[in-house]
């Protein structure tokens, strides 16, 4: 990431996209870039969680209000200068994506509407679902 960012001017807007999400729409990309330009902060697309969720601790598990959960997608979009500074932070296991690195550096993260079809293909079942979406022109 640092090598790529070193080639980008500080005032540019940069998007980081997960190659495992091949169905990202022009609308989501445009929405993320517009918001990053307008607000000069980190922008990430999200969708609502529809499943019931539980929080686990070492001692118990409890139901958690899914209305407070959002599922993060890509692209994650930032002013390049902010992201360059954030990536000077030494790596930690808590960093799960670019937004978590940026947030740790004090960068505000704004959520925008994602797209359910912007699926992440990480398992054989995901791949079969993606093939179905593509074959039946549902994307």
Question: Positions of the model-derived regions?
Answer:
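Conserved core of the sugar-phosphate nucleotidyltransferase
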Residues: 23-112, 139
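Short beta-strand-to-loop acidic/aromatic patch adjacent to the donor-nucleotide binding site
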Residues: 11-21
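Active-site nucleotide-sugar/metal-binding loop of Leloir-type enzymes
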Residues: 2-13
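Conserved Class I S-adenosyl-L-methionine
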Residues: 110, 114, 118-120
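Conserved strand-to-helix beginnings and helix N-cap segments that scaffold or border functional pockets
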Residues: 1-2, 26-30, 124
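Hydrophobic helical membrane-anchoring modules
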Residues: 118-139
């Amino acid at each position: 990431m640092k090598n790529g960012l070193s080639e980008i001017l500080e005032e540019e807007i940069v998007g980081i996209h997960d190659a495992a999400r091949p169905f990202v729409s022009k609308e989501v990309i445009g929405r993320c870039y517009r918001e990053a330009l307008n607000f000069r902060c980190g922008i990430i697309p999200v969708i609502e969680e529809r499943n019931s969720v539980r929080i686990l601790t070492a001692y118990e598990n409890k139901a958690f209000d899914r209305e407070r959960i959002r599922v993060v997608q890509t692209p994650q979009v930032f002013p390049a200068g902010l992201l360059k500074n954030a990536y000077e932070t030494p790596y930690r296991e808590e960093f799960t994506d670019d937004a978590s690195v940026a947030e740790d550096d004090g960068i505000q993260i704004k959520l925008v509407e994602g797209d359910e079809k912007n699926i992440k293909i990480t398992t054989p079942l995901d791949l079969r679902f993606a093939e179905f979406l593509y074959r039946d022109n549902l994307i």
